[in-house]
Amino acid sequence: MNFELKTLSLAAAAAYKCDLLVVLVPEGFLPGSDVLSTLTAHALKQGDLEVKPGKLLQCYAPAGVAARRVVLLGCGAADAHAVRQAMQALAPSFKLPSVKRVALVFGTSAQRGAIGAAVRAVSDGSYVYTATKTKAEPRALLRVTLGVPDAGAAQPEFATATAVAAGVEFAREWANRPANHATPTLVANAAKTLAKYPGVQCQVLGPTEVAKLGMGAFLAVAQGSDQPLRLVELRYNGAARTQAPVVLVGKGITFDTGGISLKPAAEMDEMKFDMGGAASVLGVFRALAELRPAINVVGLIPACENMPDGKAVKPGDVVTSMSGQTIEILNTDAEGRLVLCDALTYAARFKPAAVVDIATLTGACVVALGGLRSGLFASDDLLAEQLLSAGDAALDPCWRMPLDDEYAEGLKSNFADMANVAGRAGGSITAAKFLQRFVGDTPWAHLDIAGTAWKGGAAKGATGRPVGLLVHYLLERATVSTVKPKQKTRSRKSVA
């Protein structure tokens, strides 16, 4: 599917040949004398159309319009949230076999973020998973034209939106694949395909190299599986070599049975989505390759399965992480933090400006925040503010959670430097406190996407989040023209 941006008035849109012409009608719509304006004004006057987001009126082959079908679509304030809500009402239309060309015309100047919301809505709504289906109909929609009053002014937002859409789709594709079609090796191969883009490099380490690095926690999780682990290292070089990179670390558990601490059978199939963090890193690099921002980024993906086996790690086992710290594994189903802790230690070799890890880490975060916002934990206030702002801009929001030092008390162990779990209470926070022990003084953030990486039920499938958040964050960093002094790490202290 291709997107294109054109300067297109309502008068010109009437002559545009397509299968579906969507006219976004905002509050305070001011009609002109053209046929589409007249049609819209008449529908509003008669009460057949409301400007409330998502309210629509379908017209088939109206006189003077070249499109086969016209939809007048209310979009309220025409901001990003309203446009997304409006476009979601049209999602079924984007999958119709008869709809191959769509034109989307803004009835007024688009507010900031509205174009991105429209592009993402069309991309998400038309997405079709086909990788393991023999009779699936491929995506019918081939071309989407966005008509705006001034295409030149809208071009930067449009470029970002289409790149993010491509990245989100790449992430969804790999997170959706069944575990036997997305093994650690296959995920690593997907990362290698990104190296075809200018500025992107990829290196993959196997069990032997990982063992030499001393990644005992990562190795412990992988030892119960016949599928060999992979440590993927992606690099995007868009700035001078002297510029410190941002390191993204994505949890890559390609299937999580829980190990010896076996999960319940119900909905265990959804544990193929446990590599949502890894998929988001792949998606971010797909977008970076298209946007080519002036920034250096490293992506790390520790990929393996968590399986029960005679060789599997057992509750009570003590392992030595790459950092040298020992860990008592009280629950083998708390494996994500084990693979991440070694990858976070490895990240230090790049002398990063900031580290952000992304993981479907805890059910506790789902309980706390549901499926709307990802959980954000950060050791640095400025980094937290940047990620919160990026999430809002991308309509991919997160919510900052506490990191009081007292939450780490439950990680104490009689037999190791720390345990890998600290009980049920505050589970998402104690998991973040565990990870914090492996990042030193580097500005660090942890995104718990357990509630946002996929949807269950009839709409089961990966969402591609938080690719949008991360891309917007990186683009904002890239726009900073001067190198700011390194921010001092600030942990939240107890208020008691």
Curated annotation (Swiss-Prot):
EC number(s) recorded for this UniProt protein: 3.4.11.1, 3.4.11.10
Residues annotated as catalytic: K263, R337
Cofactor(s) needed: Mn(2+)
GO MF, one annotated term: manganese ion binding
CDD domains: Peptidase_M17
Coiled coil (residue ranges): none
GO biological process: proteolysis
Note describing how the cofactor binds: Binds 2 manganese ions per subunit.
Binding-site positions, Mn(2+) 2: K251, D256, D274, E335
Keywords per UniProt: Aminopeptidase, Cytoplasm, Hydrolase, Manganese, Metal-binding, Protease
GO cellular component entries: cytoplasm
Biological function: Presumably involved in the processing and regular turnover of intracellular proteins. Catalyzes the removal of unsubstituted N-terminal amino acids from various peptides.
NCBIfam families xrefs: PRK00913.1-4, PRK00913.2-4
Family of this protein: Belongs to the peptidase M17 family.
PANTHER family: CYTOSOL AMINOPEPTIDASE (PTHR11963:SF23), LEUCINE AMINOPEPTIDASE-RELATED (PTHR11963)
Protein name per UniProt: Probable cytosol aminopeptidase
